Regions:
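SAM-dependent methyltransferase catalytic-core segment centered on the flexible catalytic loop
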Residues: 220, 227-273
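A short acidic (Asp/Glu
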Residues: 48-52, 69-72, 214-218, 231-238, ...
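Class I S-adenosyl-L-methionine
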Residues: 289-335
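SAM-dependent nucleic-acid methyltransferase catalytic core
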Residues: 108-221, 226-236, 247-249
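SAM cofactor-binding core of SAM-dependent methyltransferases
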Residues: 35-96, 103, 122, 132, ...
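Conserved Class I SAM-dependent methyltransferase catalytic core
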Residues: 256-309
Length: 335
């Protein structure tokens, strides 16, 4: 199921069993099929997808189009799968000439061969399902699913200077040499394993998070905001946003050094939700658990767990790995 997700660096797929075990202590599992799981920061969709599989009806939100597309494909969509005919339709020449990808992202992000294909395919992509498949394609050809280090890989790859590419990129050389249709077929299989029905009409929206929590109704509110003092998603994934026609957004207030205060403001409008579940991290030692517990405790009783967890393990420094901690906060009104 999780193979269907975009490999965001802040994804929570490994934490889902822990998150939902804690939820079961406050909301029994036998009630989940009749309960609503509200996800204020959808991101990759890992937690909402897991909640969908557990039987919750999902109401989720994100401000980024890439996440909204993921939600429409994996959360709202209960039955429509990617077919081989869809793949061939994306590959069909449309006479559009060079597009934004070939003009702006060669050679720093894509080789010309892949850029030209992606321009054609995105022009043919008429549904969120098509767009999502192409986002999966992009991550499949990006080294370590990141969008940096053009001098280490993309420029020598485009020029055929393979001897200048470190051996750690050997797999990524092979990935980039695959024909587009072969990549699409692989990603088709991964997307389809994440598409299923849970018997509910699940809902995805694209709203400011303050507006969303004011309008949403549900039993569990899950918040996994950008962590204060960390790399902003708007910067890390600006290539994807530009390809999807999004205007460059300012850095989220939740990513700033004062991000915890922004989260405190959000909680002011969340009293109607019986259970809060909050994922957060120490940003390699920049954030303090006690501060977040204090913010949540202003509104309700609070339980906190801290554990070691690595994001981007393949590229993070050893020092950062040793310092990184993940937190799970539960705010409840139980006696």
């Amino acid at each position: 199921m999780f193979r269907a997700l975009l490999p965001y660096y802040g994804g929570k797929r490994k934490l889902c069993p822990i998150i939902f075990k804690k939820i079961s202590e406050y909301l029994p599992r036998e009630k989940w099929a009749h309960s609503v799981f509200v996800d204020a920061f959808l991101g990759s969709g890992a937690v909402s997808l897991y909640a969908k599989a557990q039987g919750f009806r999902i109401v989720a939100n994100d401000i980024a189009e890439r996440s909204v597309i993921a939600g429409k494909v994996l959360i709202e969509n209960n039955e429509t799968l990617v077919t081989d005919a869809d793949l061939h339709r994306l590959c069909f020449p449309n006479g559009g000439g060079s597009g934004i990808i070939e003009k702006e992202f060669v050679p720093d992000v894509f080789t010309r061969r892949h850029a030209a294909f992606l321009d054609t395919a995105f022009a043919n992509a008429k549904r969120p399902l098509d767009q999502y498949l192409l986002l999966k394609y992009i991550f499949a050809i990006r080294p370590y699913s990141k969008f940096s280090s053009p001098n280490a890989f993309n420029r020598p790859m485009e020029d055929g200077r393979f001897d200048e590419i470190k051996q750690t990129y050997t797999k990524h050389i092979k990935d980039n040499l695959k024909p587009p249709l072969a990549i699409l077929k692989t990603e088709k299989a991964t997307v389809n394993v994440g598409i299923f029905s849970n018997g509910h009409q699940n809902q995805i929206s694209k709203k400011d998070v303050f507006e969303f929590v004011e309008e949403a109704e549900g039993d569990v509110l899950y918040c996994d905001p950008p962590y204060a003092g960390t790399l902003a998603y708007e910067n890390e994934y600006q290539v994807l946003d530009k390809i999807l026609g999004e205007e460059m957004k300012p850095k989220s207030p939740f990513s700033s050094d004062g991000g915890m205060e922004a989260l405190g403001e959000l909680f002011e409008g969340c009293q109607k939700f019986p259970l809060w579940v909050i994922s957060f991290g120490n940003a390699g030692g920049k954030n303090e658990l006690a501060k977040l517990v204090g913010i949540v405790s202003k509104h309700r009783k609070c339980e906190a767990k801290e554990f070691a967890y690595q994001h981007c393990g393949a590229v993070a420094s050893e020092a950062h790995k040793q310092k990184s901690r993940e937190w799970l906060i539960l705010g409840h009104n139980a006696n």
